[in-house]
Amino acid sequence: TGSGYQAAVASRLAQEVYTIERVESFDARVREVFHELGYTNIVCRIGDGTRGWPEAAPFEAILVTAAGRRVPQPLVEQLAVGGRLIMPVENDRGRQVIVRMTRTSEEDYAQEHFLAVAFVPLLGAFA
């Protein structure tokens, strides 16, 4: 979540948005801002974003806004068939690239790599 910017943008593109914040003080402030601005379709919680939100899964789309060495397995498992995950991932040369993973069936996924980027590091149990 951080500042809440991505969640606010996503709330205008999706019916419902779930966002996870690691820092309690950020979460409290973002909830206030969302309330003040009338964003009623954003659900927030504090936790480890690499674990996802299994109680609300499956998701049609997952957006990760920090870079990891790989896509966290819990997030992959929480994608709906046909769902997409977008995330910056570090490649074998140590550079970050945007990855789009699409769940094509219960067991299969397609992965595409796009432009080079620079994001903050992903933190958490599955980072």
Language-model regions, residue ranges each:
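Substrate-binding/catalytic lobe of Class I Rossmann-like enzymes that use SAM or dcSAM, i.e.
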Residues: 90, 97-127
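Conserved nucleotide-cofactor-binding alpha/beta core module
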Residues: 1-106
